[in-house]
């Protein structure tokens, strides 16, 4: 990298660092700046191995400025960015559209209907976030119904029932009612019997492949014209468990020549030999399909509005046949696209995560590498931050992308004011500190915006620990934050006695550090793996569950303090 390009990198990095720091009211982070910097400046990319070092120096300088100085400097570099910070961003806020026809209902009732086959991943948070927001808006009611009527292919996990309710509470909502579909099997049987007596359902023993062929041709099953008495008798045999899996189903009569083959005489009940894991439901062998169970429940429980994926449009069309037969009015329906979430190497799928846990590749549902709500909660991310990001996606019927950086930015706004600051040095290199101007201790503030919280006292005897990438070139100065200015000479830091003006003038970068002879051993668990380091002694006084910021690294949640050191979970920059 030549000198001209290096200066351009410095200038662009400084703009990004200042903008980032002012926007989030926190110290800038190299990682948060590198992405947009390289994206906007393709000519920097061939020098990707050198750019981080330059950016690190710039970030250090910006970290040493107060808010007013940062703003003044950004105005000098790019007034448009200051104007952007000042602009009213309300027009950019995504708000949920009003629900249709709410005036037609005495009480708005919405439901989330999770399959309890495991704790929730991040994508699951969208439904309770939106439903909870709508019920708050309309003073409505939030219903949870566990759709747990498939004990074989989507086998429920007993622990998941409570885990999902805890996830909903974490997001900030409390359901008004909770149901388990497996408790309501007799209700579904009763409605099946009514349907049979109407002549609108029939038992069918055709192999699935044979029926599919007839369905494609628009040809009815030879079982379709059975009299209701025979159908009811065979259905009762299904209920009694007299058939084996795959031997008999109950079908709803629709239009066998319907233009959409998926709607032709769909299955309402089937036989499953695998017992349900819940003791209360373990004896059942005749199980309703989701479209039947859900359709009946939505009416009986009084759901007024249903939100479901765009890929489930056929469900409403199937269920409409039931509603017509029973004389019911179908709820209002809104469809949306799927959510794609970045920043994870793991497929965001409950079954995939479960397989990785069973294989020992993940430590559990709260492993920081797992894209689950339990994981981000343990990392110190507030449920409110997730809800705000999910609401920001709106209700588009197209697939939408959710950047984890959005959740991180929301969480930063929540925790930044409360999070005290500490130093953590990774891969620390010990460097002697010498010179007559050497202070006895450093006194960095607990929080840059709260002088009333006071300082941390960090005694320095003979040496400090710094990260290898922060060691300046021989003869250059660096500011040890809260301690003072030193010059790197002959593998040592020589205290210079310079005041903070050398940082404000842009001549000297700022780095964090730790005393070499008094530190706390820390293991930081991150989505990219575990990182170890040495924290300043005051970190030992933090409380478990406290959110703190390791300066120039990011926010973490304190998980435990022990004799062998402390464990924290990394939240975000």
Pin down the residues of each PLM region:
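Extended, domain-scale alpha-helical bundle/helix-rich regions
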Residues: 27-35, 51, 364-450
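N-terminal Rossmann-like or analogous alpha/beta NTP/dinucleotide-binding catalytic cores
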Residues: 2-31, 35-223, 311-327, 332-333, ...
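Active-site cores that bind ATP or allylic diphosphates and position pyrophosphate for catalysis
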Residues: 198-353, 372, 411, 416-420, ...
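Conserved structured core elements
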Residues: 122-125, 158, 162, 182-189, ...
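C-terminal accessory/binding modules appended to enzymatic or scaffolding proteins
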Residues: 19, 105, 439-573
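Glycine- and acidic
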Residues: 110-117, 143-150, 299-307, 367-373, ...
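Catalytic core of tubulin tyrosine ligase-like
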Residues: 361
């Amino acid at each position: 990298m030549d000198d001209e390009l290096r200066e351009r990198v410095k200038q662009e990095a400084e703009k990004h660092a200042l903008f980032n720091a002012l926007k989030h009211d926190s110290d800038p982070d190299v990682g948060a700046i590198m992405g947009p910097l390289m994206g906007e400046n393709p000519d920097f990319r061939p020098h990707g191995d050198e750019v981080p070092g330059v950016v690190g120096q710039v970030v250090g300088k910006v970290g040493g400025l107060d808010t007013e100085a940062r703003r003044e400097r950004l105005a000098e570099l790019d007034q448009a960015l200051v104007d952007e910070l000042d602009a009213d961003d309300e027009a950019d806020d995504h708000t949920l559209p009003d629900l249709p026809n709410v005036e037609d209902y005495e009480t708005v009732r919405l439901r989330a209907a999770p399959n309890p086959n495991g704790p929730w991943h991040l994508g699951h948070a969208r439904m309770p976030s939106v439903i909870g927001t709508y019920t708050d808006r309309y003073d409505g009611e939030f219903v949870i119904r566990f759709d747990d009527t498939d004990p074989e292919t989507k086998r429920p996990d007993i622990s998941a029932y409570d885990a999902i309710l805890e996830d909903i509470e974490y997001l900030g909502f409390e359901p008004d009612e909770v149901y388990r579909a497996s408790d309501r099997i007799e209700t579904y049987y009763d409605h099946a019997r009514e349907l049979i007596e109407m002549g609108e359902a029939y038992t069918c023993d055709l192999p699935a492949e044979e029926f599919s062929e007839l369905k494609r041709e628009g040809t009815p099953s030879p079982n379709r014209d059975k009299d209701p008495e025979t159908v009811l008798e065979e259905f009762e045999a299904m209920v009694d468990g007299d058939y084996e899996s795959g031997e008999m189903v109950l079908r709803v009569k629709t239009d066998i020549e319907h233009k959409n083959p998926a709607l032709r005489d769909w299955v309402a009940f089937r036989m499953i030999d695998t017992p349900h894991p819940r003791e209360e439901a373990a004896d059942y062998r005749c199980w309703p399909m989701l479209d039947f169970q859900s359709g009946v429940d939505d009416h009986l429980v009084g759901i007024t509005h249903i939100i479901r994926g765009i890929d489930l449009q056929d469900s409403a069309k199937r269920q409409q046949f039931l509603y017509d037969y029973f004389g019911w009015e179908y709820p209002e329906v809104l469809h949306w696209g799927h959510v794609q979430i970045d920043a994870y190497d793991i497929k965001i799928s409950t079954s995939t995560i479960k397989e990785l846990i069973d294989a020992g590749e993940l430590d559990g549902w709260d492993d920081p590498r797992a894209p689950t709500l339990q994981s981000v909660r343990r990392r110190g991310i507030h449920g409110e931050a997730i809800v705000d990001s999910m609401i920001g996606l709106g209700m588009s019927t197209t697939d939408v992308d959710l950047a984890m950086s959005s959740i991180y930015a929301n969480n930063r706004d929540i925790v930044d004011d409360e999070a005290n600051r500490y130093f953590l040095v990774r891969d620390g290199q010990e460097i002697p500190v010498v010179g007559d101007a050497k202070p006895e201790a450093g006194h960095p503030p607990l929080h840059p915006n709260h002088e009333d919280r006071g300082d941390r006292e960090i005694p320095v005897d003979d040496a400090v620990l710094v990260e290898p990438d922060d060691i300046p070139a021989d003869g250059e100065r660096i500011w040890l934050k809260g301690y003072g200015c030193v010059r790197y000479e002959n593998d040592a830091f020589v205290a210079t006695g310079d005041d903070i003006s050398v940082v404000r003038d842009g001549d000297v970068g700022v780095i964090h550090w730790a005393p070499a002879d008094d530190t706390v051993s820390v293991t930081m668990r991150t989505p990219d793996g575990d990182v170890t380091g040495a924290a300043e002694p005051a970190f030992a006084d933090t409380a478990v569950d406290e959110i703190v910021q390791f300066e120039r690294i990011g926010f973490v949640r304190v998980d435990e303090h022990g004799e062998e050191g402390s464990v924290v979970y990394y939240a975000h920059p």
